[in-house]
């Protein structure tokens, strides 16, 4: 058995002991830092500009916990987490995070629902979990009600997480439903709750969130994300960057949905290490760029599709003052070397930090150090992360530059999926997580092992027995300036078994389709082997179906093909 490990340790001062719910631990970090020196607030709401300080958040968590206890008849030390569940179907708001921490204060858990989900998807998740209420926004209320109709009016209670007026549809009239702000005001008048009796051992494995998987290859599954997993991922990330950050805290950008593992992990990791998060309700290019200058944001957490848009429209980077930016972290989808080169050319002083992770891994599993960027790499394994690469023959891949499916172990991994007869256990009998991603290790010029994530097992295309990685072909196609976005899938072929097909979104002024089709085929055939050739299997589309984190939904494209 060949096991690849992180070269970085976790310091002795960085404890993985879960002595309280993860949100409480994060606030304690901020409060401790504030006693030593001036610190920035954990969260800034970009819409209002309001800074949320740790003391204020702590009080609001307590007030909401009090009122939830009264509303639902809950007590901190009575019942199990599964007796105290709420669903959150919302855009990003600071109260989204505070509400979840209030539920944790009562020993409960939260079912997270992507704001892009349909009524049917929401109903399917709600049907599997007994929720006391669903918290949503006014713009999402109609979909919420449709989902409840599918379940005969369950859950009975709906509460509103307020969003800025400018996010409301034109002519919208607010409902008369109780808001979280009103709940917090009521909670402030109620008696204090008894302390939560937290068991550090059992608390490590206690479920904090039910988080939907991306659903890129099929129906969403509900992953059980634990308090211990979230804390571990925060500690792993801090330890990974200890050398280059030297304990410095940063102001970071986040528009990634808090219902997605990437956004949720950031919310807890940044808070746990004392950073300040500038939180957006969702991605809006003009608003995002403006906030970087307004709040002097230092670190950008992005996804490759947005980086692609910026590199293809470089004037956007000159519209506002971006002098505060020092680093860009990217994940949720492959970050090809051509994209990395494009951004590095435009902003050579920015540290590019591609990473890799997945819902089942509990967030980030690898990250590029600021001082060891390698184009095309997904970075270095986080401390305490172990990886095996399993070949098609079921044997461990040995050495570097040998591909295999990534099996991993880490204290951050989920506790499995919510039980479903149709959901396969993602773990092997000896505890390795089968990620479904294909990767390999290469050594950087500095002599450090980097992980390269090549593609998904489910997405690999078999042409005459030869494997074609869609991500490799996609990265190659994106070298053409006429292509804005692309997704490649495999389609049946009588002679070859399968062949690649490309769905392409054209860039502006791309020219006639037939001419572009010819250019694409010449480009591919001149540089890639015959199994990669597209021929007539090129379809031009106005846009690609995507998940809330920006991944192309290839299951939708396969159904269309």
UniProtKB/Swiss-Prot annotation:
It comes from Dothideomycetidae sp. (strain 11243). Residues 355-417 are annotated as: SBD2. Transmembrane segments: none annotated. Both substrate-binding domains (SBD1 and SBD2) are involved in the substrate recognition, and are sufficient to confer the substrate specificity. ATP binds at residues 213-221, 354-359, 437, 456, 551. Acyl-CoA ligase; part of the gene cluster that mediates the biosynthesis of the antifungal antibiotic FR901469, an inhibitor of beta-1,3-glucansynthase, exerting antifungal activity against the pathogenes Candida albicans and Aspergillus fumigatus. FR901469 is a cyclic depsipeptide containing 12 amino acid residues and a fatty acid chain. The NRPS frbI contains 12 modules responsible for the formation of the depsipeptide backbone which is denoted as Acyl-Thr-Ala-Tyr-Val-4OHPro-Thr-Thr-3OHPro-threo3OHGln-Gly-Thr-Orn-OH (C71H116N14O23). Its EC number is 6.2.1.-. InterPro entries: AMP-bd_C, AMP-bd_C_sf, AMP-dep_synth/lig_dom, ANL_N_sf. Belongs to the ATP-dependent AMP-binding enzyme family. This is Acyl-CoA ligase frbB. One of its GO terms (molecular function) is CoA-ligase activity. PANTHER family: BCDNA.GH02901, LONG-CHAIN-FATTY-ACID--COA LIGASE.
